[in-house]
Amino acid sequence: MKKVFLDTNILLDYGQQRARHEEAETIFCLGDIGEIELYASYLSYANMGYILRDMEREAKYALIESTREGITVLSCDNQQLDAALKQQVKDYEDMLQYQCALAAGCDVIVTNNKKDFYEFCQLPFLTSEEFLLQFDYS
């Protein structure tokens, strides 16, 4: 089964019903029916808390909780932090996300902000639309 790492923006697309909500919802559904395994970093949930800081508290926590179902949340250890620091890339947060995905043995990263991943990512990284187009539904 394919291990799919979801970047923060995919979680937000799903939870906030943003422009790419339907794609994110389809990816979550594929996880729900056992076609793929979904992973995200603990950092994504910290990022979401910060991004949504101006929301009403109850609504913010409900939104974050709505993105938790069916997701294996990955932690980050000393080795991953050190690897990210060593790379000295432009977007340190994306490098931390990548290190979490790599350590978990994820097969692909799904992100709707690919630009910073080009600098370093050795795993396939696809937008939600690209992921769904290449997914074998048979």
What is each residue range found by the language model?
Residues A40-Y42, T111:
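Short beta-strand segments at enzyme active-site cores
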Residues M1-Y39, D54-E58, E119, L132-S138:
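Short, well-structured N-terminal submotif of metal-dependent ribonuclease cores
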Residues H21-F28, E35, Y42-L81:
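Active-site-proximal, substrate-binding regions of enzyme catalytic domains
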Residues D13-Y14, A46-Y50, D82-A84, E119:
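A short acidic, helix-capping loop that chelates divalent metal ions and anchors anionic groups
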Residues T72-K115:
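Active-site neighborhoods of divalent-metal-dependent phosphate/nucleic-acid chemistry enzymes
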Residues I10, S44, Q80, Q97, ...:
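Alpha-helix capping/helix-boundary segments
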Residues K2-K3, G70, L102-S138:
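Acidic, PIN/NYN-like endoribonuclease modules and their adjacent C-terminal/linker elements
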Residues Y39, L74, P124-L126:
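General small-molecule cofactor/ligand-binding pocket signal
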